[in-house]
Curated annotation (Swiss-Prot):
A motif (PAL) lies at residues 492-494. The gene is SPPL2. The chain crosses the membrane at residues 197-217, 249-269, 279-299, 320-340, 346-366, 371-391, 430-450, 463-483, 489-509. It is a multi-pass membrane protein. Residues 95-173 form the PA domain. Gene3D superfamilies: 3.50.30.30. GO terms for cellular component: endosome; endosome membrane. It comes from Arabidopsis thaliana. This is Signal peptide peptidase-like 2.
Length: 540
């Protein structure tokens, strides 16, 4: 097996892996719903994340994040409207019986357990507390709900649950100082963040670059093919075989592609852990190195053509150009540095560079041969996205796609198979993210459109590429609108992108009477150079 074929197989394997995660989500939803905890009078709050800012002796100290209860007074959203109130521990600590300490508008801290949450809140309110902080007995947060048989739900103080480590920190503060105060508020996310604009431009730019590279290569191959025909060469190299470095998928492989992605998604969901994410990081680094190397070699070969055309035989890999040997160490070091520092705030830059390079390279290698295959692939992916974001909740009691995207149970901030940008003006921080498949799958169809336009000598207006790009941009824009309307809950991007992109291509093709040739052949009819030469000879 030569190095080129090995590279292609490696990249295809990576692309299958990456396609298993596609939902566009934001890290850390601040508003949560729970169908297992239905609302009723006096117990109808949304589960919102709450910031608990502390002060010691008037000096600002640690900030904790908790979750508001289904019952009680709603928590203010603006920091300026939140009062800075004295903190005390309840006596008894569980607040399951009337409190012995009399409070005057203090925020009381209680421990979870021994009685219902509403009983703790009623006892705290009766003692004069202005708010209730319940410390969980685990590191995770827990949604505080009302029991089905509860009727006394007229609770007029807010209740917030904090994780176990926050409780330990608060206990240490109160042990060292008697002047500890806190401020409770739940700021809202902005309707639109600049990060979403940049992410939109990043997705558009990635498909644009990949499409032009793919179309340029296809046109060069077509010109070379015609030249060989004109020279009357008996054996014309087949540009569709493995020697060209291009892999064309068919309808069967498109369906199998999505089935395999579903299987891998379930494996991710079931085996998600720290060590499994480490394995994904290694796989991502391998694919990222190959992608970055391919892009850099293609770019630099215009200035260093001699180094790009001179090869040396490397054991186990076969012939490799000097330019590839020069670029490879940089790519490897870049990926290793990202892997080492990936938990730092600046690591998203390296992740996006590796991800974009990998997507562009896969779009250069994998081709959709016609509109029929593109329709099958995107239709299957459309159903796949809807199933694993929405329908999977019925089977697994949570959205499998979103759980995998967030990297739950992994101890890390999501898996690396996505592009992300920090939310710049969001008080909660986090990232706006988009799965590789939301770029890669529509990109296959859009790149096909540009290849057809160039081979058919169509202009931007009379071609299909520009309209497919506009449709993709609108579909992705609608995705972000839906994301914000749903309070940041994960949205299957292909639910909006596929109808826009595929619908535009099919409608235009039918209107222009190109549907049959796009659906079956995928390239325009071209005159045979031999026929042209024979006609010229007969005229003499």
């Amino acid at each position: 097996m030569d190095s080129l074929r090995f590279l292609r197989i490696l990249l295809l394997s990576s692309s299958i892996l990456l396609l298993s995660l596609r939902s566009t989500v934001t890290a850390g939803d601040i508003v949560h719903q729970d169908n297992l905890a239905p609302k009723k009078p006096g117990c109808e709050n949304d589960f919102v994340l709450v910031k608990v800012q502390t002060w010691i002796d008037g000096v600002e100290n640690e900030e904790f994040v908790g979750v508001g209860a289904r019952f009680g007074k709603r928590i203010v959203s603006k920091e300026k409207n939140a009062n800075q109130t004295h903190l005390v521990f309840a006596n008894p600590r569980d607040s399951c019986t009337p409190l012995k300490n009399k409070l005057s508008g203090d925020v009381v801290i209680v421990e979870r357990g021994n009685c219902r949450f509403t009983a703790k809140a009623n006892n705290a309110e009766a003692a004069g507390a202005s708010a209730l902080l319940i410390i969980n007995n685990q590191k995770e947060l827990y949604k505080m709900v009302c029991e089905p048989d509860e009727t006394d739900l007229d609770i007029q103080i807010p209740a917030v649950m904090l994780p176990q480590d926050a409780g330990a920190s608060l206990q240490k503060m109160l042990a060292n100082s008697s002047k500890v105060s806190a401020q409770l508020y739940s700021p809202r996310r902005p309707a639109v963040d600049v990060a979403e604009v940049f992410l939109w431009l990043m997705a558009i730019g990635t498909i644009l670059c990949a499409s032009y590279w793919s179309a340029w290569s296809a046109r060069e191959a077509a010109i070379e093919h015609d030249k060989l025909l004109k020279d009357a060469i008996d054996e014309i190299p087949n540009t569709n075989d493995g020697g060209s470095g291009v892999v064309e998928i068919n309808s069967i492989s498109a369906i199998f592609f999505v089935v395999l992605a579903s299987g891998f998604l379930v494996i991710l969901y079931k085996l998600m852990s720290y060590w499994f994410v480490e394995l994904l990081v290694v796989v991502f680094c391998i694919g990222g190195v190959e992608g970055l190397q391919t892009c850099l070699v293609a770019l630099l070969s215009r200035w260093f053509q001699r180094a790009a055309d001179t090869y040396v035989k490397v054991p186990f890999l076969g012939p490799i150009s000097y330019l590839t040997l020069a670029v490879s160490p940089f790519c490897i070091v870049f990926a290793v540095l990202w892997a080492v520092y990936r938990v730092h705030s600046f690591a998203w830059i390296g992740q996006d560079v590796l991800g974009i390079a990998l997507i562009i390279t896969v779009l250069q290698i994998v081709h959709v041969p016609n509109l029929k295959v593109g329709t099958v692939l995107l239709s299957c992916a459309f159903l796949y996205d809807i199933f694993w974001v929405f329908v999977s909740k019925k089977l697994f009691h949570e959205s499998v796609m979103i759980v995998v995207a967030r990297g739950d149970k992994s101890g890390e901030d999501g898996i690396p198979m996505l592009l992300k940008i920090p939310r710049m003006f969001d008080p909660w921080g986090g990232y706006s993210i988009i799965g590789f498949g939301d770029i890669l799958l529509p990109g296959l169809l859009i790149a096909f459109a540009l290849r057809y336009d160039w081979l058919a000598n169509k202009t931007l207006r009379t071609g299909y590429f520009i309209w497919a790009m506009v449709a993709y941009g609108l579909g992705l824009l609608i995705t972000y609108v839906a994301l914000n309307l749903m309070d940041g809950h994960g949205q299957p991007a292909l639910l909006y992108i596929v109808p826009f992109t595929l619908g535009t291509m099919l409608t235009l093709a039918r209107k222009r009477d190109d549907l049959w040739i796009l659906w079956t052949k995928g390239e325009p009819e071209r005159a045979c150079p031999h026929h042209v030469r024979l006609e010229q000879c007969s005229e003499k």
